[in-house]
């Protein structure tokens, strides 16, 4: 690692909530120090600003926004292997935000691209996140950090583009009716849509 990379690592902001997040997983599944470090490093390197377990108003297992990640606390009950896949999938989106920026990631909802283009982009980002999460899981197995026969699901591979197109169109109409035109407002909209106070 060269000097510039070292300085960047030192100056990186800490991910808000990460210690509590890791502790909640550890209290449930008693992870090795090596696994805790692997998950923590993966999250921090994504530039994720905040991460937390919370109740969700509906069945989604996670939500990635430009300013953080929410994981449905029900995912804690699905087994460590599946939970890791969900975390890796949502953090993969943080890497996408890091690579493309929030303007590109949110243009599906408020951008000038067509609904078809938006649906294709969204399907691609979801499929890439699934594949990335699968690779991270296989890396854990290969490094003998965990011992598992878990086969990570490809949750978005078989979702028809027409279904994603309909979802994008509905979100666009909703955001237009609420005059949502910025990344901050999109993040607030989705945060309030999924987070339950229970």
Describe every region a protein language model picked out.
Residues 1-15:
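Short acidic, low-complexity intrinsically disordered linear motifs used
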Residues 26-47:
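Zn2+-dependent metallopeptidase catalytic core
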Residues 31, 35, 84, 125, ...:
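Hydrophobic (often cysteine-bearing) scaffold residues that line and stabilize catalytic clefts
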Residues 41-70:
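Catalytic zinc-binding patch centered on the HExxH motif and its immediate surroundings
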Residues 70-87:
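Short pre-active-site segment immediately N-terminal to the catalytic Zn-binding motif
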Residues 81, 97-130:
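Post-HEXXH active-site segment of zinc metalloproteases
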Residues 85-98:
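Active-site recognition of the HExxH zinc-binding catalytic motif
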Residues 115-126, 131-198:
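Long, well-structured alpha-helical subdomains associated
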